[in-house]
UniProtKB/Swiss-Prot annotation:
Protein name: Imidazole glycerol phosphate synthase subunit HisF
Superkingdom of the organism of origin: Bacteria
Active site, per annotation: D12, D131
Designated gene of the protein: hisF
InterPro entries, A to Z: Aldolase_TIM, His_biosynth, HisF, IGPS_HisA/HisF, RibuloseP-bd_barrel
GO molecular function: imidazoleglycerol-phosphate synthase activity; lyase activity
Listed Gene3D superfamilies: Aldolase class I
Organism the protein comes from: Bifidobacterium longum subsp. infantis (strain ATCC 15697 / DSM 20088 / JCM 1222 / NCTC 11817 / S12)
Assigned protein family: Belongs to the HisA/HisF family.
């Protein structure tokens, strides 16, 4: 793999504050997303992902404020997702300093959103966020992986592999593949899911969900991911960005 593997911390932001515990002794306020993003920038993160978990219109301006303040201190690509429903939402986030914008539920409800955003701003701006899991109960998908919404609580019955292929055709520039089964388990990424998606799409895949120790990261790249994303292992200080990069390098992967 010639391109450098990207290591991306993810910050879940609720009403302007980071949620999921954060333990950094050197931060005045571990709940402030701008301070935390700056800390990860100092640690050598390749990108930062913000997920607006409130994502209601009432908090949209709060997120715009967070992004614009972060852009003044952090000089690596920033992706912002959560509650993005229209090309106008994308426009306002790009104007305040985001480099890429993540879409999820709105694209499931109206797939034309993908092509409208890609046509207006370019494919490189659009990250399709997919919360997928092994099917449960009544749902039967061809691949055995289905797309969920509402943080994995709501089944859609949509085949996850079919959906990523369709999104690529419509103009998505990248897939943020989050395994709802692995999420929070700290038992490693869902390698089978990554392989299944890699077989079907050419665009970059960001693997998310399940990172618990440094050894979890190289297998995700081996399975076909181009980047790795994690939240709690970084927030709790279990691992640093440098730890992950050193492990990837040890396995022969290029890192920045």
């Amino acid at each position: 793999m010639s391109l450098a593997v990207r290591v991306i911390p993810c910050l879940d932001v609720d009403a302007g504050r980071v949620v999921k515990g954060v333990h950094f002794e050197n931060l005045k306020d571990a709940g402030d997303p701008v301070e935390l993003a700056a800390e990860y920038y100092r640690q050598g993160a390749d990108e930062i992902t913000f997920l607006d978990v409130t994502a209601s219109s009432s908090h949209r301006n709060t997120m715009i404020d967070v992004v614009s303040r972060t852009a003044e201190q952090v000089f690596i690509p920033m992706t912002v997702g959560g509650g993005v429903r229209t090309p106008e939402d994308v426009d306002s986030l790009l104007r305040c300093g985001a480099d890429k914008v993540g879409v999820n539920t709105a694209a499931i409800n109206d797939p034309s959103l993908i092509s409208r955003v890609a046509d207006r701003f370019g494919n490189q701006v659009l990250v399709l966020s997919v919360d997928a899991r092994r099917e449960k109960g009544e749902q039967h998908t061809q691949s055995g992986f289905e797309v969920t919404t509402m943080g994995g609580r709501k089944s859609t019955g949509i085949d996850a592999i079919w959906w990523v292929k369709r999104a690529e055709q419509l103009g998505a520039g990248e897939i943020l593949l989050n395994s709802m089964d692995a999420d929070g388990t700290k038992e490693g990424f869902d390698l089978e899911m990554i392989r299944a998606v890699r077989k079907e799409v050419k665009i970059p895949i960001i693997a998310s969900g399940g990172a618990g120790k440094v050894e979890d990261f190289p297998p995700a790249i081996e399975a076909g991911a181009d980047a790795v994303l994690a939240a709690s292992v970084f927030h709790y200080g279990i691992l640093t960005i440098a730890d992950v990069k050193a492990e990837l390098k040890k396995h022969g992967y290029t890192v920045r």
